[in-house]
Regions:
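Bacterial N-terminal signal peptides
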Residues: 12-25
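Active-site glycine-rich loops that stabilize anionic/oxyanionic intermediates
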Residues: 64-67, 133
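Short, flexible, surface-exposed loop segments at domain boundaries
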Residues: 307, 314-489
């Protein structure tokens, strides 16, 4: 019924065809570079890391204590081929400003407000949110404030219930509940230390002596700053308010049933595996993966966690015929004979295709050719001819899912040779070349505009859909039949 997009390049081909603003991708891609930035948010200088194309689905990474976005240094390059990845440092942590007390009264509500305004300033109203440790309280508050922003959640050692917290830690949290006396503040501050950081990094790790010391060395810089230590101490004192908010977070999860992935270091000294199961109690379809490691699971298992995220949130291809349209809901009978429901929203991009005069195919044309092995070469199933401004879209040769064994080639035509029953196209992408035979029976098309009025029962469509709430699939881009021309992809 569904077919994951094969690679980001294949997805870019589709995105351009649909004139969509998003690039939809499949499995974890090659490493892409991470860039480093500062933003002014609520009068504070906030540091953040960024990777990937902003046209792709956005993955917001919310770090833990006493860490920073440095926690995601290995994860971000692995996901940048599929997602637009952003990872801010909270005020007083990492490279973000640590404002004095008169300028910033730390609490999880306040940190959430800063992150909320940061996300809004980037124009990112839809997010998959990755939460670890302190990221849980921030991410869940963000979800409660803006449920329409949330396209999915990843919990990594971040709790929503008390049974996910080690008993010794629960006793400590109870001891700092209530008015912040000097004794309570001293107890909270005793945990804001390099010793705590080392415990969280090393306890439960498979090979603690093989861990990269850059992690806790980076944290040590913030822990040595008096204003940073004060801010982190204030956040420790605010943890009882997170515990009080657990029922609201659980209710939100039960109501919205977001697409949820749980990746958990089972040897975490403070957040135990019962915390992962508690999430699945609220979201029964949540997927859980345990790792034989500690609190900072990414230190040892970033490769597999990246694979899990990429696979779990990968969009799917839906091909079929519209059965019904009710408001923003489109029901499709897929080509495999199944029923698939698609949800439309303001981000859904619509397009159609129209026939292209194959006699106009000439050297210099930029095309996307879906093909299958035929004889000693490739035989085209269809060819999309791009407008000049779309040159370079999805350039390369890669697997495609139109038919068994099919591939997609985005390339420039270097030669056209007339042959009986069709023509051969010599194609170049980068330094590579190949030949594709285009039979007269293969559709040759180009882009045409379309609107929601073209989504009518009986029309054929090709959609790229991403996971949404309640097990639904949100249509990011749709190519629909128009004027009798069916989308061949």
């Amino acid at each position: 019924m569904f077919r994951p997009a094969s690679r980001c390049l294949a997805s870019r081909f589709l995105a351009a065809l649909l004139a969509a603003s998003a690039c939809f991708a499949g499995p974890v891609a090659h490493a892409d570079p991470v860039s480093y930035h500062y933003a002014s948010v609520d009068g504070l200088r906030l540091f953040y890391r960024e990777a990937g194309d902003r046209a792709k689905p956005t993955l917001l990474l919310l770090h833990g204590f006493p860490s920073s976005s440095h926690e995601f240094r290995d994860l971000m390059p692995l996901l940048a081929g599929q997602f637009h990845v952003i990872a801010p440092d909270y005020p007083g942590m990492g490279y973000s400003e640590a404002p004095p007390a008169e300028r910033f009264a730390p609490s999880f509500d306040k940190v959430t407000s800063v992150i909320e305004h940061f996300v809004a300033s980037l124009g990112e109203p839809h997010l998959i949110v990755y939460m670890t440790d302190f990221g849980g309280p921030v991410g869940m508050r963000l979800a409660l404030h803006h449920p329409d922003w949330i396209d999915g959640l990843v919990f990594q050692n971040a709790v929503i219930s008390e049974d996910g917290v080690d008993p010794a830690r629960r006793r400590r949290d109870a001891a700092i509940t209530g008015e912040a006396t000097e004794a309570k503040r001293a107890l909270a501050e005793s945990h804001v230390s390099l010793a705590t950081a080392l415990l969280l990094y090393r306890h439960g790790a498979r090979e603690p002596d093989a861990l990269n010391p850059d992690a806790w060395t980076n944290d040590a810089a913030a822990l040595a700053n008096p204003d940073s230590r004060r801010i982190m101490t204030d956040l420790q004192l605010d943890i009882p308010n997170n515990v009080a908010a657990f029922p609201a977070w659980q209710a939100w999860l039960r109501e919205h049933q977001p697409r949820t992935l749980v990746v958990w270091g089972r040897n975490d000294p403070i957040f135990v595996p019962a915390g992962a199961e508690a999430i699945r109690r609220e979201v029964p379809d949540a997927a859980i993966h345990y790792y034989d490691t500690g609190h900072f699971a990414l230190e040892e298992d970033h490769d597999d966690i990246a694979r899990q995220i990429g696979g779990f949130f990968a969009p799917v291809h839906v091909r079929g015929r519209i059965e019904s349209v009710e408001g923003a809901t489109v029901t499709v009978r897929t080509r495999e004979g199944a029923t698939q429901v698609l949800q439309l929203d303001a981000r859904t991009r619509l397009a159609a295709v129209k026939p292209y005069d194959r006699a106009r195919l000439e050297p210099g044309s930029y095309v996307g050719a879906a093909a299958v092995p035929s004889g000693a070469g490739l035989g085209a199933l269809e060819v999309m001819v791009y407008r000049e401004e779309r040159r370079g879209t999805g350039e390369g040769h890669y697997a495609w899912d139109l038919a068994p064994g099919s591939s997609m080639t985005g390339a420039t035509v270097t030669a056209v040779t007339a042959e009986p029953g069709g023509r051969d196209l010599d194609l170049r992408y980068g330094s590579e070349t190949l030949r594709v035979h285009v039979p007269d029976s293969a559709p040759v098309v180009t882009y045409a505009p379309a609107g929601r009025e073209d989504l009518v029962p009986g029309a054929y469509l090709f959609a790229v859909a991403a996971p949404g709430d309640h097990g639904q699939w949100r249509a990011g881009a749709i190519s629909v039949e128009k004027d009798g021309v069916k989308p061949p992809l």
